Amino acid sequence: MANYFNTLNLRQQLAQLGKCRFMGRDEFADGASYLQGKKVVIVGCGAQGLNQGLNMRDSGLDISYALRKEAIAEKRASWRKATENGFKVGTYEELIPQADLVVNLTPDKQHSDVVHTVQPLMKDGAALGYSHGFNIVEVGEQIRKDITVVMVAPKCPGTEVREEYKRGFGVPTLIAVHPENDPKGEGMAIAKAWAAATGGHRAGVLESSFVAEVKSDLMGEQTILCGMLQAGSLLCFDRLVEEGTDPAYAEKLIQFGWETITEALKQGGITLMMDRLSNPAKLRAYALSEQLKEIMAPLFQKHMDDIISGEFSSGMMADWANDDKKLLTWREETGKTAFETAPQYEGKIGEQEYFDKGVLMIAMVKAGVELAFETMVDSGIIEESAYYESLHELPLIANTIARKRLYEMNVVISDTAEYGNYLFSYACVPLLKPFMAELQPGDLGKAIPEGAVDNAQLRDVNEAIRSHAIEQVGKKLRGYMTDMKRIAVAG
């Protein structure tokens, strides 16, 4: 099999990278009706598998779970989760032949084995669904021509998909139809019904492509979403301890600082996050972020280049074939870092303290979000897609660190995201060490004193923050989500 993206000519590559259309609410007037009365079989009962299935069942669809014989015989976690929630469970051979839609929600590295097993069992004219297009785009999986291939990709962890649905809302979602597999022209109808069944249509749906979803998703998770948070955590902790800060306090400031800072990001973008600072601190955070962008731009560009070319995927798949040797080594090394093993701080840190003493962390967030967004857009990815894969998902990942530090983040994210995270963070930490050595008092761990500021400089910095393209598209998309939630609640 060959990387699908690399089989396309340049015009086709650019067309698929740039496919992104915000869909209107009226396009989902039929809800999930296209799939009602049809059999939907989900393969895999992890976080996405279980929670999407619960939402789809509550939306009136016929949902069952196909598991491997040994998972059923040994009553593994997937079997327990499905049966405890009242779902029908069976083997591939029992359920797949009757399925109208088979949804593959297993981890990326299992996709090829799963598809090779289920494809011969699928009836003529059935549909195959994914929530991430890696298997189609990067592995280059060939699917029978009578099978329709679609994607519904919620831009949140599975638990959030369920919780937002229960609130009467949903999470922003990308949908796509694989252009090589839409024999009956029904792919978009299937994808729309599936997205509606998960509640995604109530938060906003982007019509995208498998290519755009994969390339932007990989870039976001490797850089700002996971790699930058990991590198930033390790660098900031070590710097604080070197300066004499109590390791327990330093650990808490960082562990919960990311979540507190990015909560402002979620509500009002980079503008609101920066507005939480005093004027002198805002000017300093802006200056630090500009320095960071200059230093890190080549690293972000290298990751994007390796994602576009397929270099990243081929390297990771080689590690799959080598029993995840690199991944497991990096995971073990991360677990032994000083940040991960630091004692817990029992005292309280007030919300504003995280901002006042985390100026560098805010600068890292701003620089990372803007760089990821800019690099994706420069590579042909549309701004809305780049926003969802950078700023939008960052608070969700920061929340995992608040739960159990980097360990929890790396457990929750996919192995694909974890592998990319380590690639980035292992390069970023040494890259930023000279920068860290030049920090000034007040950049981290101590508040910057109030003082006079130059009005013209403050005016220009505020304008630069607010006029960045990610702030413009973010304001539009956040406004749309707020309006949609208001409509959903009123309904």
Curated annotation (Swiss-Prot):
InterPro entries tied to this protein: 6-PGluconate_DH-like_C_sf, 6PGD_dom2, KARI, KARI_C, KARI_N, NAD(P)-bd_dom_sf
Residues the record marks as active site: H132
Catalysed conversion reaction: (2R)-2,3-dihydroxy-3-methylbutanoate + NADP(+) = (2S)-2-acetolactate + NADPH + H(+); (2R,3R)-2,3-dihydroxy-3-methylpentanoate + NADP(+) = (S)-2-ethyl-2-hydroxy-3-oxobutanoate + NADPH + H(+)
Domain KARI N-terminal Rossmann: 15-208
Record-annotated KARI C-terminal knotted domain positions: 209-344, 345-484
Required cofactor names: Mg(2+)
Function: Involved in the biosynthesis of branched-chain amino acids (BCAA). Catalyzes an alkyl-migration followed by a ketol-acid reduction of (S)-2-acetolactate (S2AL) to yield (R)-2,3-dihydroxy-isovalerate. In the isomerase reaction, S2AL is rearranged via a Mg-dependent methyl migration to produce 3-hydroxy-3-methyl-2-ketobutyrate (HMKB). In the reductase reaction, this 2-ketoacid undergoes a metal-dependent reduction by NADPH to yield (R)-2,3-dihydroxy-isovalerate.
Protein name: Ketol-acid reductoisomerase (NADP(+))
Species the sequence originates in: Escherichia coli O7:K1 (strain IAI39 / ExPEC)
